[in-house]
């Protein structure tokens, strides 16, 4: 009975009536005490490095790495469009963690200040995380974030902004340094044509051996912490001193990895000299982020540097990019390039067959890959994924260029409301008519969807793009605009064409704000901006037969619906976000096609009214009143239209004339059977 009284009270509750020296409870407490005491300050010196996003032929900016060290996380790389989708595929929790973000390009020459931060705003809006992130980036990126504060002002996730500087190193145009005394040191420089980031964890105390401590008679309680802190303690009986080296293992060596960026082969000499400066501790993991044209024999030779002998190399470059779609659960709705000859990158298929030529200890950086750095080793794990070869066979063609004199061709690029889902990107549509292309809204990821839809025909389509209509300034309708404009500008480098943008007045003010930090001076000079309110009474005449007008919608202030009118092929009406609108019905009467939002199912009508949206049956009523020849329902809430959704009232408007839109749908006016691009 005396022995049982010595057992901790909680052990008695669990029926652990063994003497304390051998009780299950005591042993577990001893083993876990060091781990869970002062959790915010512990350092296990084990680094988990995972790939949040990797480079794909249709991804404009990548990659993004997540480094986990105990209860801290560090995001390194670029947060390009649809980063929020990538975060959703990660099991990691960023809520209660201390997070530092380093947005950095491979070099200053390749800096696309908008591109590396375009996905940040959507993530801030949709994450729901209540935390503060320390964000470190070049000054133009910080300036863009500050000037786009309206995009995330209501987010519970706050940003502590820190600009890179050149004060510490006169040779570096941008440099950064972060020291967290208990955990790690991060430093780097971004030069004109290359960059580096080094990540060093701190040496950690050795592992406390609970079994040895029990055997030597270490008193249960604070004595464990004293031994770990380097102090000697007396045994239980008070007769013997017990020293740290008796119960604490040797210190755990610091872990060390590197990120190297390169945009010019002329930088290899400087990079080699930099590697020569490595001291006695060499990195075990090196991430290489390369611009197009860098990967090849010269760079492979650089990988054989003597101080890389212990390192595992991970290469991110378009030449080795995988064929995975952004929306991996929606493979049937994505058109993937069999040859990957995207106009955006101008790559020949023959240059892509290099994965079999990778040197030893060299791997392609992929989202399925994660690395664990521990005990000066880099261990690689790769989760199973679908076969790119099978996908390439399945998606062997792109949409052809729309023919002239065949009426309207509508390509549905995105159909989701508010946030992208695994099956739907954000609102965006492309209309082709008589050799002219018009885009309706540009949600985040619009240009990637455009690439995916037209592939090798992307550049010819962009050369035909004459106008973009932005219905209103909710971010899910215009955050992809800048990347669309930059792609258009690149496709039209050798001509003097202008592009018309119709939208709310504040849209142009925002673009003007970003002119300097995003380097948009030349692009904005090619834009003719028309305030949407003006086209209510004065349509924009694109050709003698084709015009665009607008109708105020019932949604938020300064929001509009769009009507494209052709003298021969009739009207194509796009509702944008709105409640059923009698003015739109009158303006669009007899439309060849009505593209109408259908955010909520009928049983959520009360919410549709509250949020100024429409239900499916309300959209049918608009089509019936308008006498539209065809109706496409789009802009679906994430909570609606699952396998068991409530169908609308088909007595209002014929089901045979109605289509539920999916990303990748192509509607052609004079085809009896509409074709989905699968």
Swiss-Prot record:
Q: One biological-process term from Gene Ontology? A: tRNA 3'-end processing
Residue span of the annotated presequence: 1-37
Annotated GO CC locations: mitochondrion
Principal place of residence: mitochondrion
Q: Which cofactor does it need?
A: Zn(2+)
Q: Which UniProt keywords apply?
A: Cytoplasm, Endonuclease, Hydrolase, Metal-binding, Mitochondrion, Nuclease, Transit peptide, tRNA processing, Zinc
Which reaction equation describes what this protein catalyses?
Answer: Endonucleolytic cleavage of RNA, removing extra 3' nucleotides from tRNA precursor, generating 3' termini of tRNAs. A 3'-hydroxy group is left at the tRNA terminus and a 5'-phosphoryl group is left at the trailer molecule
Q: Give an example GO molecular function.
A: metal ion binding
Q: Cite the EC number.
A: 3.1.26.11
Recorded hits in Pfam families, A to Z, give: Lactamase_B, Lactamase_B_4
Q: Which InterPro entries does this chain map to?
A: Metallo-B-lactamas (IPR001279), RibonucZ/Hydroxyglut_hydro (IPR036866), RNZ2-like (IPR047151), tRNase_Z_dom (IPR027794)
Name the family.
Belongs to the RNase Z family.
What is the role of this chain? Zinc phosphodiesterase, which displays some tRNA 3'-processing endonuclease activity. May be involved in tRNA maturation, by removing a 3'-trailer from precursor tRNA.
Name of protein = Ribonuclease Z 2, mitochondrial
